[in-house]
């Protein structure tokens, strides 16, 4: 059975500046590099290696994938890219619209501003992953993506998380892949929070 390790990139310059970072990009910070090393240490400690490594086409994800895996042969996939925040790209996060009461995502709030609907993001990421999975018989895959993209995927999969849980930098979702390429979340691992583990 294939195991998919889907993780968020390390901290970036825009993260520290609290700027919206979707389709725009910024480099990993020194802390972001350290976070990637924490994730790498987790995989090494658990004896986990990867048959193939994938990342979004954005630099912050590809650089994280290379650092975590220790490999240069990272396959870039556009479908793993971060959500498009439209006119809010690179702007202060404080300018973003607020979630509707009771909501746990932007839903379609950014569409009028040229952004994406989080549900469409989730479908895009899900379809991209399934396309890879249906064409492989490999046992262990690493994919590096982005916070909102991963959240959208989990919404598409109808996964619920405990209150207050979010994808911090280099958060790792461990999925078991069934024969029909469907995904079952087994664990969420947070290397930057003393390797805290949530089981599902």
Sequence positions of predicted segments:
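Acidic, low-complexity terminal tails and accessory targeting/binding regions
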Residues: 2, 76, 83-94, 137-139, ...
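Generic beta-sheet signal
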Residues: 4, 139-147
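Loop-to-helix element that buttresses phosphate recognition and phosphoryl-transfer chemistry
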Residues: 4-62, 113-126
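Phosphate-coordination/substrate-recognition cap region in phosphate-metabolizing enzymes
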Residues: 38-100
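Glycine-rich phosphate-binding loop signature in dinucleotide/nucleotide-binding domains
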Residues: 46-49, 132-139
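Active-site signature of alpha/beta-hydrolase-fold catalytic machinery across serine-
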Residues: 67, 152-156
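Short glycine/proline- and acidic residue-enriched helix-loop micro-motifs
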Residues: 100-120
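GST superfamily/GST-like fold recognition
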Residues: 147-151, 171
